[in-house]
Structure formats: structure tokens, C-alpha cells
Amino acid sequence: MKRIWIQRIGAAVLCAVLLAGCMPGGPAADSTASADPLTGQEQQYPGQRPAAVVIDNAPGSTTQWGIGSASVVLEAAACADTAPSLCLVYPSVSAMPTVGPVTLGQDLFWRLLSGQQVLPIQRGCDLYTRNFLDYWNLRAVDALETGRNAFTTGNTDWASPLWCTN
């Protein structure tokens, strides 16, 4: 009999402890600054859409611009016989410096970043990438379409354009 009472008292104490843990505490610290979904740090460009640029990473490519200021750098080998491409992600278009050399867009990068609703920036794309962009009704800023309105080369070589926001 005494054992049953001890078990009941133990169960009641356990229930009280568990229910006390569910009660709302004091006032929580209200964070006014939202976190950047790319880095987790304080958001510097609230309400602006992230932008991502695919740049060439081949051994013979020209100097790469803008890598140091990117929030996220993705590297992936989309084709077996080519060098991996780099995808530089920035919190907004206004946060981007001159970036390049811009190269062929890869659907792998756009699939990875689709949850962030990034603005894709590329120089042409293959059939799979075009189908992905068309299916999700995404419009990439393409150097082959916009030309010198958004891109510069600094010389006559249009094969490796630089993204320029100024």
C-alpha cells in the first residue's frame, strides 16, 4: 500500500515538473533584425532578392573577380570532362561588385538555390538548364541576351564577360 502511494506521488511530481516546463516564461528577447538566409548573420539587404552568378573555374580562365565578397560560394562539376564551375551568391544585386568571368549556367546550381529565389546570372545555358528555368518560369540575366547593357569585357573578347552593376 505504501509502495502504491509513493508511485502516485512520484507520478504527480513528474507531471508537475513536465507541465511547469510547458508554461510560458518571462518576456522573450525580441529580435528586430532578421537573419540572412544565406549566412545566418544579420541581414544587410532586407527585402531584396539574392543574386547568383556562375563563373568560369577552368585552369586557363582569366582572373576571377568577386569571389572574396560573395556570401556563399558553390563549386560543382556538372560535366565529367570539364572543370568545376563556381556559383557566387550575393544577398542582393546591389551588394555585387564586378564579377566574372561569367560562364554557362548550370541547372544544378539553380536547383540548389531555388528555395532562396535567387536571380540567376549566366552566359548561356544547356537544354536541361533552359527546361528547368522555363518549367519554374524563371528568367535568368543572360549575357548572350542582354549584351553590353549589364556586362562588360574590358576588351574585345566576348567569350568571358564580367557582370557589372555600376
Residue ranges of predicted features:
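A surface/extracellular/periplasmic glyco- and lipid-processing/surface-interacting theme
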Residues: 29-74, 79-166
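Bacterial N-terminal signal peptides that target proteins for export
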Residues: 2-13
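C-terminal motif of bacterial Sec signal peptides marking the signal peptidase cleavage site
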Residues: 18-21
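Bacterial signal peptide processing site
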Residues: 23-26
